[in-house]
Amino acid sequence: MSVMASDKACAPVRASRPFPKQKLRELVLQALYALEIDPEGEDSLVSLLMTEASVSKKNAAYALMFCRAIRANQPDLDALLDATIRTTTLARLTIIERNILRMMLFEHQQNQDCCPVPVAVLIAETTRLIKKFSYSEGSSLILAVLGSIFDHPAPALDTPLEPTSMCG
């Protein structure tokens, strides 16, 4: 426990529990979906996430930060995905499938320097998110695309997050 220097009684302060990465990914996916449906709705997104996902304002804002970074890199992410997908186009995938691909690709590229997430973890999370938010029939294409991309070194992002944003 730590104490706050500004408190006269020096009352102990409990550190908040770290926000689980699985929950963060779900929030980011929901935010990406909402913004693809309503691109002008970012102003109300934090309160929407707080209400619908029952999370704190801090955690909703944290998820929105990732959402913004993914959207800032979307042209590069989509170009890589379009170059990898062979049997269809990115535009023909569902909104959820596109955003799962973007999010996992972003996380893979983002964390290469500071704390790389093992590919097996990203694949397992992709599978979990597809089962929870999409149709399992689409999982083989999504997993094949990510597997193909993860086999090669990740290109650098134009708009990275803070170096330790996804770490810990």
Curated annotation (Swiss-Prot):
- Give the family from UniProt: Belongs to the NusB family.
The organism encoding this protein is: Chlamydia trachomatis serovar L2 (strain ATCC VR-902B / DSM 19102 / 434/Bu)
What GO CC terms are in its UniProt record? cytosol
Q: Which Pfam families match?
A: NusB
- Species lineage: Bacteria, Pseudomonadati, Chlamydiota, Chlamydiia, Chlamydiales
Listed A to Z, the keywords are: RNA-binding, Transcription, Transcription antitermination, Transcription regulation
One GO MF annotation is: RNA binding
Query: The organism sits in which domain of life?
Result: Bacteria
Name the Gene Ontology biological process terms.
DNA-templated transcription termination; transcription antitermination
Q: Which InterPro entries match?
A: NusB-like_sf, NusB_fam, NusB_RsmB_TIM44
Q: What is this protein called?
A: Transcription antitermination protein NusB
